[in-house]
Each structure stands twice: as structure tokens, then as C-alpha cells.
A protein has these predicted regions:
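Juxtamembrane transmembrane-helix boundary signature
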Residues: 131-151
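Helix-loop-helix hairpins and the membrane-proximal interhelical loops
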Residues: 58-121, 234-235, 269-351, 495
């Protein structure tokens, strides 16, 4: 008797194929119904695919900017989309940076004119340097930053070196040039971190407050709040219109900054300038607008050989330190803010802005503008949404427009610019709280920097005294191992400076 072979469970569970299923449909009605359903499913799938493709094409057409290909390439080089920004935000950020730093083209020429330089020519040089340096930062650094002569370096040149008769202006510009070259070489060879390690942390943190004290002192002196007495400084005439306007400007400026009002510096300068017209402080002579004055008397007016004297080493270091640490802090702050706000992994190379800054220092000295640096007020652009160098280009364009207003800048009184100088200086002094007060061997050198700067009215000499005091205090405390070998190399030059100055 033949037995049937058992069927495999796999074969029994396998579904029927399409051909067997169609053959199983005996009646024509069922066969026709199957093909109708198949056509409906295919039509529905085709409709879905077509709608998805149409939507993607429509999205591409909507997101594509309506600009020419050449203009698209120029704008695309900034990486606006990669950093999470738009062209509108970049424009707003550029205007914000301009309003936050426009006071420089008024304050700095006034400070340099106190040293005997022609105000109109200096104003032209400063505006040109600010516009070109800021544009270079936008094109090559691709960061929203404004470059302008720093108040600390300008104060050192105008009041310590030139006005006190220590050196002439070409020699001072030579010092600025060599400090910029040192900054450039350190950036090219990548040894910025080595220099930062040589200078003690307490001295680095005291450099900013020392510059702030010196800047505030300059503001008090220019406003007549402080005058030279028979043996020391004395209180000026507080009842004079200039002193009253300065004090009023300081109070208003502090209130505006506390409320984070944009363009507070410009508001105070314009308000006091207008109020000063009936008080006789503002003198309007001639048309407020016109062609800028020729800067030919300041162009390439520089002494590169005479500025290399060993006696000027502390001043060279003062220029370098103020430029180096100021630029480093601002660049790192702005780049970190951009990275956190954009929420992108795009790496921002800080080497390029350092190259632009150091090159601008050298170029500025050739144009008669000392110590070009990256301004901390550039953070206003990052706060306004600026992420790329396009913001810097907008700010540079605004500064270039100011060239036709150089006669108006000469009419602004010192009572209008002094509040800005005082508030900026006091704000920088607030950084002294970061110094470690638990270790006297670190605290005392920082205090020496501030006290010597205030007593001698020279933050270059104050920094030199702090560096020399650091070595002496560490040796006396038995902590000579904390001294970097580079400090031992600098010590003989510092000793020579004080012996020569005695």
C-alpha cells in the first residue's frame, strides 16, 4: 500500500504566487476586479511620488535667492547659511557694530590732537584705518569685528611719549610698527601660547585694569576734573561748564549702559555737543560737511631705526601686551559666541583674525594711527545676530561715509568725549576682580602694576615694574620655580630700563 509523502510545513505555509492566484480566479468578474484594484494602487503610488517631487522642486525654487550667479558666489564665500545667519541679520549686526564703535573717530583724534597733531588730518587717517582694517577683517578673517586704534595705545603715544617729551611722533609710530611685526611673527609661527605662558597670569590680568586706570585718568584730565597742582594732582573747577557736562555725561552713560541701550556712546556725544552750543563749548566754524583733509603730513612719517633703542623696550612691550591680550580676548569671546549661538560644528580658525589684526597694526603705524586693535564692542554685532565677515563690510562702509563729516568731528568738544573715555576706563578696571587674592606672591605684583601706573601716569612703566616685582617677590618667597625661564631673560632688560630712567 502506497503512502502519501508528508508535505513540508514550509511548503504548506508558503503563500501562493501571483500566477497561481490569478489562475485560481475562475470567474471573469473576479479577474477584472483584481486588475482594477492593481491599477488603483499604482495610480495612488504614482500620485504620491509626483506630489513629493513637485514639492521638492518648489522648495528649491523658493530657497534660491533671486540674485545673479556672480553675486551669489560673492555672498556664499562668507558661509552665511553654514553659520546659521541671513543677509538681513548681517546688515543689522553691521549697523550695531558701527553705532557701538563710531565714537572712536571722535575720541581718538581729540586725544592725538592734544599731542600737537593736526586734528583734521588725524581724523582722516583714523577713519581710513578703521574702514580698511574692518573691511580686511570681513574679507579675510570672516568675523563680525571692528578694528580701530585702541584707547590704551593712543593714550600711551599721545600723553606719555609725545606730550611729555619722551619721544617724537615718528619714533612712537616705529614702536607701534615693531610691536605689530612681533605680533605677526608670533601668529605665523604659532607661538602665541608660548608668550602667554611666559607672562605671569596675575600680570596678564592686571594689564587690562592698568590700561583702564590710565584711560580714565586721561578722561578726567581732558575734562578739567583733575589738574596739576604744585606738588601733586588737585581737584579741578567742578563749577565750570566743561566739568558739569562731563559729570552729567558720565551719569547718563552709566544709566544707558546699565539698560543696554544700543549706541549709548553716540547718544551722549551728540547730546552734549548740542547742549554745548549755547554754553560756548561747541564751536561751529564753517560747513559741517566737506572733503576730508589731506593726511599727507602723517603718511609714512615713521622712524623705524630710532625706535629700536633698548631704552624703549618697556614701551614696546606695553604696546605688544595691550594689543596681544586685548585681541586674543576679543577674538576668543566672539568666536565662542558665534559657535554657541549658531549651533553648528563649523570650526572657526582664530589664526586668520590674528593675522589681520597684526597686519593692521603695521599698516596703521604707516598711516599715522597707533595701536590698531580689535574692539570689545564688536560683541554687539554677535549679539545682534552677526556671524560672518559680511557684518564687518557693512560697518566698514558706514565708517567710509564718515569721511565727508570730518569738519563736524572737529567741532565736538572734549566735554562730550571725556565721559566715554572715563566710562570705558572704569569698565576695564573692573577686570581686576579676577586676580587670585589668596596668594600674595600673585596679588602683590598685580597691585604694583596698578599703583605705579596711577602714580607715574604711564602704564608701560607700571607693567615693567610689575614684571620686575614679580621676579623679586617670587625669589624672596622661595618660589623661584614658579618663574618661567623667559622671565629670567626679560629681567636684565627691565633692570636696565629703570637704571636708565633714574
Amino acid at each position: 500500500m502506497l503512502r502519501r509523502r508528508p508535505v513540508s510545513p514550509l511548503r504548506r505555509a508558503s503563500p501562493p504566487t501571483a500566477s497561481s492566484f490569478i489562475r485560481s480566479l475562475d470567474r471573469p468578474a473576479k479577474r477584472q476586479q483584481y486588475y482594477v484594484c492593481k491599477r488603483l494602487h499604482f495610480a495612488r503610488f504614482s500620485s504620491i511620488v509626483f506630489r513629493a517631487k513637485e514639492a521638492s522642486v518648489r522648495t528649491e525654487q523658493t530657497d534660491r535667492p533671486s540674485v545673479t550667479p556672480s553675486r551669489l558666489r560673492r555672498i556664499g564665500r562668507f558661509g552665511i547659511a553654514e553659520r546659521g545667519s541671513t543677509r538681513g541679520r548681517e546688515l543689522t549686526a553691521g549697523l550695531s557694530m558701527f553705532l557701538a564703535t563710531a565714537y572712536t573717530v571722535v575720541v581718538i583724534p581729540g586725544m592725538l590732537s592734544d599731542a600737537g597733531l593736526p586734528h583734521a588730518a588725524v581724523t582722516t587717517c583714523v577713519i581710513v584705518v578703521v574702514a580698511l582694517g574692518t573691511a580686511a577683517m570681513g574679507l579675510f578673517g570672516n568675523l563680525p569685528m571692528v578694528l580701530a586704534p585702541g584707547l590704551g595705545g593712543v593714550s600711551l603715544v599721545a600723553y606719555t611719549l609725545v606730550l611729555d617729551g619722551n619721544v617724537d611722533y615718528p619714533t612712537a609710530m616705529g614702536m607701534v610698527f615693531w610691536s605689530g611685526l612681533a605680533f605677526l611673527l608670533l601668529t605665523i609661527f604659532g607661538i602665541r601660547s608660548l608668550v602667554a605662558r611666559i607672562i605671569p597670569a596675575s600680570i596678564r590680568m592686571a594689564i587690562g585694569p592698568a590700561i583702564g586706570i590710565f584711560i580714565a585718568f586721561v578722561g578726567f584730565r581732558s575734562a578739567g576734573l583733575t589738574v596739576a597742582g604744585k606738588s601733586s594732582l588737585e581737584l579741578g573747577d567742578l563749577a565750570s561748564p566743561a566739568a558739569l557736562m562731563t559729570l552729567l555725561g558720565v551719569v547718563v552713560l552709566i544709566a544707558l549702559n546699565a539698560r543696554k541701550v544700543p549706541g549709548s556712546f553716540i547718544i551722549v556725544i551728540v547730546a552734549i555737543t548740542i547742549i554745548g552750543i549755547p554754553l560756548g563749548l561747541t564751536k561751529l566754524d564753517g560747513a559741517p560737511f566737506g572733503l576730508p583733509a589731506s593726511p599727507s603730513g602723517l603718511l609714512f612719517h615713521i622712524d623705524l631705526i630710532g625706535s629700536l633703542s633698548p631704552h624703549y623696550l618697556p614701551y614696546l612691550f606695553a604696546f605688544f601686551a595691550s594689543e596681544f591680550f586685548s585681541t586674543t580676548g576679543v577674538v576668543m569671546t566672539v568666536t565662542d559666541h558665534i559657535g554657541q549661538s549658531a549651533g553648528t560644528t563649523t570650526q572657526i580658525d582664530p589664526k586668520r583674525p590674528f593675522l589681520v589684526d597684526s597686519s593692521s597694526i603695521m599698516a596703521g603705524s604707516l598711516f599715522g594711527s597707533p595701536s590698531v586693535t580689535t574692539y570689545a564692542e564688536s560683541a554687539a554685532g554677535a549679539e545682534a545676530g552677526g556671524r560672518t565677515g559680511l557684518s564687518s563690510l557693512w560697518a566698514a562702509a558706514c565708517f567710509a561715509i564718515l569721511l565727508i563729516a570730518t569738519p563736524l568731528a572737529g567741532a565736538i568738544p572734549s566735554a562730550a568725549t571725556a565721559p566715554v573715555v572715563i566710562v570705558v576706563g572704569l569698565t576695564i578696571v573692573a577686570g581686576f576682580r579676577r586676580i587670585d587674592s589668596s596668594d600674595l606672591t600673585e596679588l602683590l605684583p598685580a597691585v604694583i602694576v596698578l599703583v605705579c601706573t596711577l602714580l607715574w601716569g604711564n602704564f608701560g612703566t607700571g607693567i615693567a615694574a610689575g614684571l620686575l616685582g614679580y621676579v623679586l617677590i617670587k625669589v624672596c618667597a622661595g618660589k623661584w620655580k614658579d618663574i618661567h625661564p623667559g622671565m629670567w631673560v626679560m629681567t636684565p632688560f627691565l633692570v636696565y630700563f629703570f637704571i636708565a630712567a633714574a
